[in-house]
Swiss-Prot record:
Residues that bear Phosphoserine: S178
Major localization listed first in the record, in broad terms: nucleus
The name this protein goes by in its record: tRNA-splicing endonuclease subunit Sen54
Similarity comment text for this entry: Belongs to the SEN54 family.
Organism of derivation: Mus musculus (Mouse)
Protein location: Nucleus; Nucleus, Nucleolus
This protein's record includes keyword Acetylation: yes
N-acetylmethionine found at: M1
């Protein structure tokens, strides 16, 4: 049934400038919403004229509400043009307040995504043109929501979240930090390297680091690594000399770079010298004993850098201890010593009790005489390996010498929780485990939007948005339920940000999520 035209009503075509009479009529129309309740509900028609009149009035109010067009000032609208070939909307006039959280800049132009332009068109913030003709909201729905841009379900979720006040941005897979980068705390560093266009900035520190080896390579002469070896290792020290003589001049020029830039040659020299001292010690004594250290720490004087020290001048180091192009000089450390904080830390009673409890069960590594006898890091690792081997050797032969062995080693039975963990059949797993192997098996589902909280609108920056509050994956009510493979893939792509599934059922939107949980254990038995 078509609505009857009301006398005095004004029909205004979309995009046309109103005249004075039309503007007065648009301003004077009622702002009240239609009455939602008209008394008791009639379940069946009774054929009376009163019922037909009530039904006609309800339909007339509904048609008037749907046919009413929004009137906006032309000067407050931002002009924009839809470009279907590129798939974006380009602003032809300066943007408004919405530019703080929406849109992006590329090639010096301000652009909007289709969902952003359609939402702003419904809000009355922009005027959208296509082929120099203004578009109505119905035409914009038909042109902007296609298979190449985004679906109608995605726009429903986008507009719903925007009306709730959230900041919604398109999901970029390149912005997700890998678990390895999060383990190394590189997520903040990677965020600082990205500018507004999503490109990596050049780092000045990287250029300076690359320039330093060139200067060293040109200025440092080749140095033989066997020059400081002891006489007891003459036979072993001939190999570096023969290699340096047979090598090309290019390899000889790279030798100081390797010596200065890496600690491995230094550790190799120290290891060779320590080995030579060990061999000479074994030959002199004729028995295996504790190796003698090369350095006598009683004769080495370390500078006193305490705040109460009178002598704060540090003399220049010996020239033979420095590279050829480095000049050492003395330093007065008085200003630095005055900045030292000598005040004793004041702990509360609770902190002192906790510290005392922790110290009761803490073993001091330096108190171990065997550890103090190690002269290098390699000897300390060998000591730990030897102790681990001795600890795993004592096993009852009648239990471990047969085909059937116990479920776990006695050394691993430290507590009931460890025993239950080793003998459990179902191991604890997380939803994102193994997701890197399933990146191509998402099952058609994909993450659509990054959602930021509404209270972050005032401080939100598009070039540095920060960590999203949640990530949104959109599905229809008639679509199949995602399988475990798809859930693992999407959870891995989301990283450490919670993943929310938006389920759209004929305009009604419900939100679901999958979370990890740990099964309880009975440790009392």
């Amino acid at each position: 049934m078509e609505p009857e035209p009301e006398p005095g009503s004004v029909e205004v075509p979309a995009g046309r400038v109103l005249s004075a009479s039309e503007l007065r009529a648009a301003r004077s129309r009622s702002q009240k919403l239609p009455q939602r309740s008209h008394g008791p509900k009639d379940f069946l028609p009774d054929g009376s004229e009163a019922q037909a009149e009530r039904l006609r009035l309800c339909r007339q109010e509904l048609w008037q509400l749907l046919a009413e067009e929004r009137v906006e000032r032309l000067g407050s609208l931002v002009a924009a043009e839809w470009k279907p070939e590129e798939g974006f909307v380009e602003l032809t006039s300066p943007a408004g307040k919405f530019w703080q959280t929406m849109g992006y800049s590329e090639e010096g132009r301000q652009r909007l995504h289709p969902e952003e332009a359609l939402y702003l068109l419904e809000c009355g913030s922009i005027q959208l043109f296509y082929q120099d003709l203004p578009l109505s909201i119905q035409e914009a729905y038909q042109l902007l929501l296609t298979e190449d841009t985004l679906s109608f379900l995605q726009y429903q979720v986008f507009s719903h979240l925007k009306r709730l006040g959230y900041v919604v941005r398109r999901f970029q897979l390149s912005s997700v930090v890998s678990p390895y980068e999060r383990q190394l705390n590189l997520d903040g560093y990677a965020q600082c390297l990205e500018d507004g266009s999503g490109k990596r900035k050049r780092s000045s520190s990287c250029r300076s680091v690359n320039k330093k080896p060139k200067v060293l390579q040109n200025s440092l002469p080749p140095v033989s690594l066997a020059a400081s070896s002891s006489p007891a290792c003459d036979q072993s020290s001939q190999y570096p000399e023969e290699k340096s003589q047979d090598s090309s001049p290019r390899q000889g020029s790279e030798l100081p770079l390797q010596f200065l830039g890496s600690s491995e040659p230094c550790s190799d020299l120290a290891r060779e010298d320590v080995g030579c001292d060990r061999e000479s010690h074994k030959i002199e004594n004729g028995a295996k004993g504790t190796p003698k250290l090369r350095w006598n720490f009683e004769q080495i004087s370390f500078p006193n850098m305490a705040s109460d020290s009178r002598h704060t001048f540090l003399p220049a180091p010996a020239p033979e201890l420095l590279p050829a192009n480095v000049i050492g000089r003395g330093t007065d450390a008085e200003s630095w010593c005055q900045k030292l904080n000598q005040r004793r830390e004041k702990l509360s009673r609770r902190d002192r009790e906790q510290q005392a409890v922790v110290q009761q069960f803490r073993e001091d590594v330096n108190a171990d005489p065997e550890v103090r006898g190690c002269s290098s890091w390699q000897e300390y690792k060998e000591l730990l390996q030897r102790r681990q081997t001795q600890k795993s050797q004592p096993r009852p032969p009648h239990l471990w010498g047969q085909s059937v062995t116990p479920l776990l080693d006695p050394d691993k039975a430290d507590c009931p929780a460890a025993v239950l963990q080793h003998i459990s059949v179902l191991q604890t797993t997380h939803l994102a485990d193994g997701g890197y192997r399933l990146l191509e098996k998402s099952g058609g589902l994909q993450i659509s939007f990054d959602v930021y909280q509404a209270d972050a609108v005032a401080t939100f920056r598009k070039n540095s948005p920060g960590k999203p509050y949640v990530r949104m994956c959109i599905s229809g009510f008639d679509d199949p339920v995602p399988d475990l493979c798809s859930l693992k893939c999407l959870t891995y792509q989301s990283g450490d940000v919670p993943l929310i599934f938006a389920l759209v059922d004929h305009g009604d939107i419900s939100f679901y999520s999958f979370r990890d949980f740990t099964l309880p254990r009975d440790l009392g038995h």
